[in-house]
């Protein structure tokens, strides 16, 4: 087409980069498409140098990532019982409490985490009053470590102490285990920092009544295939992070036979059934350790750039990468953007909190929002947004989950295998849907919404990976 012909034709413009020109095009009613292009790695010269160095190892990285994906995807994980944490969680010592997210000292912890720790100290009987518990926590006598350092995960505050019951999940393919506490339900619960007597009594009931019954029941039915439940639930409107209605119902359907066969009083059996039945979030504490057990099978694969952990402690967000020697890469956690319960505002919320982003790391949760359109009523946005997030995550992932498919997207598999390189190059961050805790201990959940990891977590990991490359 000759350039003079342009003046007689209708203009159709593609705008690349700066969105400011788009406003002028709108005013002039010119048909246009905006391409949100940004330079690789945001134009950061040091990151581009790191990417150039990494590119020299491309074949080894591709092979390592393929192996990592294969190990995680082939992991068959079963719930095999409920036990006291001190009897099964590796290296969990007396006077030790585990928490969500990366390493942090007690003095720097967020309000909900401190509140939950005080509750755990009272539950363990290490102190008699809240004041004594707070002094003990500050004294240095108790050791605090991340759940992830002990093959465990915990929602929100993620507090795990020696006498707490945990679900025991076993990776039958690779022989590793993962652990998670029992979900207490909603309202005033330990994971949001509540530590009143009714909270502690519920925890005691879980230990004395619920745990032994469920342990026997699960053994009677030969364990529970958690992967199979997640696969079904995603096709029934769940994403198995913030929406677990179908998954919890499917789990109850699996275990009710074992419960009725168990040698416990009828009243105790009914209480256990009702506890699960009334708590639609029960399955979260199974989907999380399922993801942990399968992702741990993909740890420590040399040259792999795939993320094995995303976790938050209410102060910092931390990630781990398969080929980065179990190092934590941290940055200040973001605030969650979403919907608040009546009476609360953004000024009430703590920063992003919890180990539950392990679900997104495995390719469910926020990555599967397209399968759970009803969740937008809980976290905000539109159904179209949920579908788009599930599609967009393919741009930063190495592979897909053939087992977890999204019906509204013609059964498209969820994206899986967050690739450090793709995140830094594209400036696209993983999407996480999550609950919001009040910044003060004991108040509880104040809303839910969406959040991203800080970009800096990935840039730090990229530089570390590049600096430690060797043949």
Give residue ranges: language-model regions:
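Anaerobic metallocofactor- and corrinoid-dependent redox/one-carbon enzyme cores
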Residues: 2-471
